[in-house]
Amino acid sequence: RANGLGTEGIVFGGKRMGLYFLESGASFRNSNVVYDREGSSFATLRPGMIDWEKIFADADWFHWSGIAASLSQEGADACLEALQTADRMGLTISCDLNVRKKLWNYGRAVADVMLPLVQYSDVIFGAEPEYKEVFDIAPVGFQAVDTAYPLDLKGFETFGQKISHIVPRCRKVFLELRNTITSNHNLLAAVLYSD
């Protein structure tokens, strides 16, 4: 509140806040995340709980995350409700795919839920494995071991075109590239496809 951030749109629910635990990796053993979201406020979100028109009244951009659709069918339905309202109100819509397979445990495949939702997005963010999970498009590949690694720009352009073909509304595709050398040594890059 001290910084002028409104809190009147906050919806309270669930039995508790969701938690996650990070077990840091060591050497060649990757980090591990344990999610504890069952019964949490976010996991109990349902359509009709949020007045999206009121929330979006002065907005021009709505950003959503695949995590919102991952916890339950009701959460995915609430996400659809938000997307339809944002679309109707003329907002720019962006999506971070954020596929966390450990969260998808309500019997629906990631692509079956995400593909209809992502159709509302003007901008999409994600890593290669997330695009593979949602769109079933083979990654271009990123095996950098240093900064001299040559990016396959034509391959990434084709990748972006494929996404834009599946999601005609999408004009920008951001792609995170990561090559894990050890648990604490990663090489990162990003590519933007703009239609």
Show where each model-derived region lies.
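Conserved N-terminal subdomain of the carbohydrate kinase-like
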Residues: 1-67
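A short helix->loop->beta-strand "cap" motif at the edges of active sites that frequently abuts
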Residues: 85-92, 167-171
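Conserved phosphate/ATP/ADP-binding segment of small-molecule kinases
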Residues: 103-194
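Short beta-strand/loop segments at the ligand-binding rim of alpha/beta enzyme cores
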Residues: 89-98, 103
